[in-house]
Amino acid sequence: MLVHIPNVLTPEQVSMVRDRLDRAGDAWVDGRATAGYTGAPVKRNQQIAEHSPIARELGDVILAALERNPLFISAALPNQVYPPLFNRYEGGMTFGSHVDGAVRVLPNGVKLRTDVSVTLFLSAPDEYDGGELVIEDAYGVQQVKLPAGDMIVYPATSLHQVTPVTRGVRVASFFWVQSLVRSDAQRALLFDMDTAIQRLNASGADTDACRSLVGCYHNLLRIWSET
């Protein structure tokens, strides 16, 4: 399930984050520092050092925005969120086809299962050529290039890549979510149900029927969730 979540950050927040990243200097390091065994050979980009003060500062801005975003919560059903990371592609940089590692270790040593991958775009599409996020899923190949401040949520099991950036600079944040529901198929069903319930409520549909559907949603979540 791929979900496009618009306007996660406001234009003012995007501008602030970009300004801080553009002036980050030595905080930018070789992106292979966080790549796994299969990802490192095909990864060629730059990344803000994972535990640097600027990564924590800007990551907190994103985490606060996620807490206020009902579409993200509905789609990802987050249990734990890995602290957001930041990357940059320019001058032909790319990240070849790979699957994200199954487990990440949080700063406190707790292990996080990567159920959901997230990319938050911080560069406008007209700022760079190339740099599409290409995701292979059950429905084929999806190419993603979103406005700055918009986010794509997709299963971490997906084979994906970032195509070479041939002009300009592509800046983004990326992170992972351990969901309450580890199965993508089950998350997709719950997301569709939640979306339908919200539309029915907005249309003034029969209250008892809506209440029954809400009960079904929560009972399924109760069966499938892991805390």
Swiss-Prot record:
Residues annotated as domain Fe2OG dioxygenase: 80-179
Q: SMART domains annotated for this entry?
A: P4Hc (SM00702)
Q: Which InterPro entries does UniProt cross-reference here?
A: Oxoglu/Fe-dep_dioxygenase_dom (IPR005123), PKHD_C (IPR041097), PKHD_hydroxylase (IPR023550), Pro_4_hyd_alph (IPR006620), Pro_4_hyd_alph_FE2OG_OXY (IPR044862)
**Documented EC number(s):** 1.14.11.-
Q: Which Pfam families match?
A: 2OG-FeII_Oxy_3, PKHD_C
Give the record's keywords alphabetically.
Dioxygenase, Iron, Metal-binding, Oxidoreductase, Vitamin C
- UniProt GO molecular function: 2-oxoglutarate-dependent dioxygenase activity; iron ion binding; L-ascorbic acid binding
Record-annotated disulphide pairs: none
Where is the signal peptide, in residue numbers? Answer: none
In terms of superkingdom, the source organism counts as: Bacteria
Q: How is the cofactor bound?
A: Binds 1 Fe(2+) ion per subunit.
Identify this protein by name: PKHD-type hydroxylase Bamb_4479
- Which species is this record about? Burkholderia ambifaria (strain ATCC BAA-244 / DSM 16087 / CCUG 44356 / LMG 19182 / AMMD) (Burkholderia cepacia (strain AMMD))
